[in-house]
Amino acid sequence: MEANHQRNDLGLVALTMLAQYHNISLNPEEIKHKFDLDGKGLSLTSWLLAAKSLALKAKHIKKEISRLHLVNLPALVWQDNGKHFLLVKVDTDNNRYLTYNLEQDAPQILSQDEFEACYQGQLILVTSRASVVGQLAKFDFTWFIPAVIKYRKIFLETLIVSIFLQIFALITPLFFQVVMDKVLVHRGFSTLNIITVALAIVIIFEIVLSGLRTYVFSHSTSRIDVELGAKLFRHLLSLPISYFENRRVGDTVARVRELDQIRNFLTGQALTSVLDLLFSFIFFAVMWYYSPKLTLVILGSLPCYILWSIFISPILRRRLDDKFARSADNQAFLVESVTAINMIKAMAVAPQMTDTWDKQLASYVSSSFRVTVLATIGQQGVQLIQKTVMVINLWLGAHLVISGDLSIGQLIAFNMLSGQVIAPVIRLAQLWQDFQQVGISVTRLGDVLNSPTEQYQGKLSLPEIKGDISFKNIRFRYKPDAPTILNNVNLEIRQGEVIGIVGRSGSGKSTLTKLLQRFYIPENGQVLIDGHDLALADPNWLRRQIGVVLQDNVLLNRSIRENIALSDPGMPMERVIYAAKLAGAHDFISELREGYNTIVGEQGAGLSGGQRQRIAIARALVNNPKILIFDEATSALDYQSEHIIMQNMQKICQGRTVILIAHRLSTVKNADRIIVMEKGEIVEQGKHHELLQNSNGLYSYLHQLQLN
């Protein structure tokens, strides 16, 4: 009745869903009590005030349909008649709108005409304060500005060295001018010797300072690289489970590898070329002093370089995008193939996999070749402009020398100075491909670094949990347009109780435990431990006190001891051995040559499936968690290993709340209570013998199937 009453106020329903989307928990009744004073539902003003009270940033705007694709979604479409709904996604290519019908509690895809019929032009944009801060700290090229400021002393030293290098570059042509116009004309050998020695000293200083600049610059950019790499890995491990479940492993790895492109760019010549380019104004002043006409030729060539780059850049970027997409596909396919090598060999499908690889590799090589061809065309275009300018300057300079407006020494000095000006321009033009590639890399890496992490700040780190668990009115789906996985689930689990959960595949058993670990926030309802809402709890605090054993567990390429004591490497050996004995793993570990120091191999490849499972159980028990989850934990064990664990089950369960998820009913028959699930709902619960008394029940049906 309460749910129906809340459903009548679609504004309150929308606020609840949007708050949970932003990982903010609320009590609908409390919001209704504070802001729905007349009992007629939340008005526009009260809705905005309620959102503000939840630390949400809400803004009411009027937006034309043609511009809806520009706003941050999901957003609330406000209707004067109270029939509000959520706008989740705008598909501009097909003119379709993914919405969420709050009345029917279901997603809907509307056509352009259908959406226009119900859209009144009013929209409420909602974001969390944390999201606003995150958007201000987005990863793009501006991310490097604080890093540059942090190492400003080093960059200032680099700038000073660059100034001296430019002074030396300015002096060298003057020496050549003196030699050509004075020494050769007057045959001044003593002056020649002095100039030669001075030039040698300048060259030595120039080489030393240039090397020093490169060293200092590379050292500072390497520090930035380390900071970025560390930030990337920390951020990657802080991302929610949903990020990894919605992306291919190879695609994520490919994005992380883009760090190499950024590293190469930072430690390359591009940034030093920019510094050299900044000093070109001084050279232009000296060149203008020599010959305004020749200087105008050089200045006239600069727009040609810029226009050529503007023409090439968009095409190059599209081809680089395509190249990255092909590379990511190859990376994903390679990771998938190596991971599934046992299946590939068992089914003898290597020829089919090879054929797919060959096609994908050919596509990547073709895409890479198109990038190379375009880059070559770009570089040759730059060379053409440079050679053309050189010919014009030679012709015009010769005329000026013949007419007496310029000496031979001045012409040579001018050409040397123009080379100092054009060289960084050409280097930058040639490095433009690298810059485009780095732009792509920053965008791809931004997909990782700009994805919101699980929020820890402001979350409650509560005292050690006791083990009381409550699921209240839980409704959950993995995606807005996906089917409902859990529907109106209510379950109370007392401290120290052993609960078995059974049901057909896809009934929502494992999803319950994922909500308990706070991998996801329910669409509706609350998950509480000891009366504390998990939406407000620190995920790390929670997960440290929950032991989980899955059907397929992953071991790291370390020793058995390190795998068991993964959460506390300094754990006493006695605790490790005790946990291994409880899990039935101590005997087989003792028989190994290296014992607990045996390296298990990548993902535990050096052990059998049953051995891996027992080590995983020991790993879950070693921290003495107050809540223990066995999700098909014994299904991969042989009967002897399962028998050992079931014998120890009383010790394992002592002093903790245990949730056993199993298809084998024999695993849960001794549980204090058995929960039977079907299509996301709890259909039966009771003890083993009580459930068998209902011959028409699902539990009896499953029990009969296993007996047969």
Curated annotation (Swiss-Prot):
Q: What cellular component GO annotations does this protein have?
A: plasma membrane; type I protein secretion system complex
Q: What topology in the membrane does the UniProt record assign?
A: Multi-pass membrane protein
Annotated ATP binding sites: 503-510
Please report the stretch or stretches of sequence annotated as the ABC transmembrane type-1 domain. Answer: 155-437
Q: Which Gene3D superfamilies match?
A: ABC transporter type 1, transmembrane domain, Cysteine proteinases, P-loop containing nucleotide triphosphate hydrolases
What are the subcellular locations of this protein? Cell inner membrane
Q: Which parts of the sequence belong to the ABC transporter domain?
A: 469-704
* Residue span(s) of domain Peptidase C39: 1-126
Q: Which superkingdom does the taxonomy of this entry point to?
A: Bacteria
Provide the top EC class. translocase
Which family is this protein grouped under?
Answer: Belongs to the ABC transporter superfamily. Protein-1 exporter (TC 3.A.1.109) family.
Q: What does this protein do?
A: Part of the ABC transporter complex LktBD involved in leukotoxin export. Transmembrane domains (TMD) form a pore in the inner membrane and the ATP-binding domain (NBD) is responsible for energy generation.
Q: What is this protein called?
A: Leukotoxin translocation ATP-binding protein LktB
